[in-house]
Each structure stands twice: as structure tokens, then as C-alpha cells.
From Swiss-Prot:
Catalyzes the interconversion of methylthioribose-1-phosphate (MTR-1-P) into methylthioribulose-1-phosphate (MTRu-1-P). Keywords: Amino-acid biosynthesis, Isomerase, Methionine biosynthesis. Gene3D superfamilies: translation initiation factor eif-2b, domain 1 (1.20.120.420), Translation initiation factor eif-2b, domain 2 (3.40.50.10470). Its EC number is 5.3.1.23. Substrate binds at residues 48-50, 93, 198, 249-250. It is an enzyme of class 5 (isomerase). This is Methylthioribose-1-phosphate isomerase. Signal peptide: none annotated. The active site is at 239 (proton donor). Belongs to the eIF-2B alpha/beta/delta subunits family. MtnA subfamily. The keyword Glycosyltransferase does not apply. The keyword Transcription does not apply. One of its GO terms (biological process) is L-methionine salvage from methylthioadenosine.
């Protein structure tokens, strides 16, 4: 079976990823023929966005199994060697919980199968299931979130939580897409999202392709456009949500949440249940990835800072649950108190 979306294509023998580092100026694709290439693509942000990383890792796991099964026909040995594949993929990005969720799911499927025969097909089917479920989940998130947006609303978003950050459709941008599909006129302000410029490079490009009225602003303009009354709601995605509703997302999200709170603007987080980590009580326990100093020292490949200056470059921050108006999931919209209602969500659904 095969899969093809804007973000990725699974051919059965390789995983082809759109190189998000090159957008919007070039549409270049990277072909990953083994799990090491998949791991490198995740680490170097050829692919990014928590749900997309999870699905990518699942296909990387399949490629690892294909490689190992060519050398070994002993099921127990395969299981042991697949632990190395899982570890290689898992250590690429520490913050996005979907990565670990997808790999755990693949490993459980491996163990549940319990034999060498038919193993690759079973794992491939599971990876495809993860990918296709993501699309269905995102559309459900979109439908649930669209009810929060009125016709004529202007929405601010940060980073990119669209089709490029998922297998397809998107979480935060999926809400905007669903609202548009319902006939609502929605305008969008997109933060540029320094230092990696996901808002400028990816969100603006993606929304323009879909015919949205989108305005790009630098990150330090967000407070001013809010004060001017231009923004009706903020919608962002998430890389990990703690059991109490604290949200780890792209650096700068916390700043936007504080500003929205100050101006009385609802701040919504759109994310699948797979992004909620019930093993983590609060955002204080979420590991925050730090990336290369060069991302801050340069812009568009040109150096913008003096030599030898100190640099701090966390890729994510944590927004306190008190600043979150609601969390939009595929099962419905969750409101405070989050610790209680998130638990109910997993136990009963909404």
C-alpha cells in the first residue's frame, strides 16, 4: 500500500519527504531509503511538526525492519535489533511526544505479531494506519474547532501547525480550513516565528496556496495588532501537552499567550490526543530541545550578529494552562479545569 500527501510519500520501499528547510522558494524532496536517513531528516528538520514526526518515525521503523529481516530470520534477534532502530529514531527530537508515541505503537505491534513471517507487512500496515488516522484526526479537530470561530473572524497563529506539520490537513490550520469549508470568511495573521521562520516560510506559503487572506508579521508585532483590535482569536498547535494542560509548543508561543490574556483574546490549542502526555504532571517535566546557535546568529544564510556573542536557542517554551482558553482535540473541545477534564477525556471521551 502507498500514501502520498503534501508532506510525505510512502512508496513501499522508501519515504519521500518535502524538504521544509527549502520552502517557500524551492519544492525539493528528500528520499529516505533506510531508517538512518529518516532519523537524519527528523533531526535536521527536513520534516517537522509533532504529528508529522510521529508518522515519519513509524515509516522509518518499517525501513529498519526491512533492513534487519534481510540479514536475520530469527524473530528474537529481530526484536533485539529493532530496539536499536527505535533508539536511533527516538533520540532525534526530545520534545515532541508523538515521536515516542508512534515508536511505542510500532514496537507493540512488532511484539504482538510474535513471528518472523509476514512481519514487514504487519509493520507497514501499522505505519499506514498511523498516517491515515492522523488525517482523520486532524479533520475532526478542524470540525470541532471551527465552531469556535465566527464568520469574519481574524485569527493569529504562531509557527506552522498545518498540513506540513502533520500527514495532511493540519491541527491549528485545520481549524481554519474547516471554518473556510463551512463558508466562513476567516482572515489570518501569521507570526514569522524566529529563528527558524516557520510562520513566514511555511504557514504563509501553505495558507496562500489555499486562498486564505493572510498577513505576515514579525513576532514583536503581535502585541500591537492585538491592542489595535485586529485579532479575534489565537490558535496554535502543540508538541506536548502535560496532564494539567500546560502546553509545550514552538518558542514564542508563551509570549503570544501572555499577550492574548492581557488583551482578553481567547487562546486555543489544537492538538490530537496523541500529543497529550498523561505521564507528565506539568510543563516543568517536559524536556526542552536546544538547537544550534547558528539558527539565531544567521537569517537567510547571512550572519546578523557579532562574532563570539553568547546565544541561547531553546526550540520550545511552555505555556501555563491558566493562559489556555481551550484545547481542541478530535474528541471535542476541552475546557478548564484541565487536569480533571483531560483525565475524563481519556476515560470516557466527551
Amino acid at each position: 500500500m502507498k500514501l502520498k500527501t503534501m508532506t510525505m510519500e510512502w512508496t513501499g520501499d522508501s519515504l519521500i519527504l518535502i524538504d521544509q528547510r527549502r520552502l517557500p522558494f524551492e519544492e525539493v524532496y528528500v528520499t529516505c531509503a533506510d531508517y538512518r536517513a529518516v532519523a537524519l531528516s527528523i533531526k535536521e528538520m527536513v520534516v517537522r511538526g509533532a504529528p508529522a514526526i510521529g508518522a515519519t518515525a513509524a515509516f522509518g521503523y518499517v525501513l529498519g525492519a526491512k533492513e534487519i529481516l534481510k540479514k536475520s530470520h530469527n524473530y528474537e534477534q529481530v526484536v533485539m535489533q529493532m530496539k536499536n532502530v527505535k533508539e536511533t529514531l527516538a533520540k532525534t527530537r526530545p520534545t515532541a511526544v508523538n515521536l515516542f508515541w508512534a515508536l511505542e505503537r510500532m514496537e507493540k505491534r512488532l511484539i504482538r505479531h510474535g513471528k518472523y513471517e509476514g512481519l514487514v507487512k504487519v509493520l507497514e500496515d501499522e505505519a499506514l494506519k498511523i498516517a491515515k488516522e492522523d488525517i482523520e484526526v486532524n479533520k475532526a479537530i478542524g470540525r470541532n474547532g471551527a465552531q469556535l470561530l465566527q464568520d469574519g473572524f481574524t485569527v493569529l497563529t504562531h509557527c506552522n501547525a498545518g498540513a506540513l506539520a502533520t500527514v495532511d490537513y493540519g491541527t491549528a490550520l485545520g481549524v481554519l480550513r474547516a471554518a473556510k469549508e463551512q463558508g466562513k470568511k476567516i482572515k489570518v495573521y501569521a507570526d514569522e516565528t524566529r529563528p527558524y521562520l516557520q510562520g513566514a516560510r511555511l504557514t504563509a506559503w501553505e495558507l496562500m496556496k489555499d486562498g486564505f487572506d493572510v498577513t505576515l508579521i514579525s513576532d514583536n508585532m503581535a502585541g500591537w495588532v492585538m491592542k489595535q483590535g485586529k485579532i479575534n482569536a489565537v490558535i496554535v498547535g502543540a508538541d506536548r501537552i502535560a496532564a494539567n494542560g500546560d502546553v509545550a509548543n514552538k518558542i514564542g508561543t508563551y509570549m503570544v499567550a501572555v499577550l492574548a490574556n492581557r488583551h482578553g483574546i481567547p487562546f486555543y490549542v489544537a492538538a490530537p490526543l496523541s500529543t497529550i502526555d498523561m505521564s507528565i504532571k506539568s510543563g516543568k517535566e517536559i524536556p526542552i530541545e536546544e538547537r544550534s546557535h547558528e539558527e539565531v546568529l544567521t537569517c537567510g544564510g547571512k550572519r546578523v550578529a557579532p562574532n563570539n556573542v553568547n546565544v541561547y536557542n531553546p526550540a520550545f517554551d511552555v505555556t501555563d494552562h491558566e493562559l489556555v482558553t481551550a484545547i481542541i482535540t478530535e474528541k471535542g473541545v476541552v475546557y478548564p479545569p484541565y487536569e480533571e477534564n483531560i483525565k475524563k477525556l481519556f476515560e470516557e471521551g466527551i
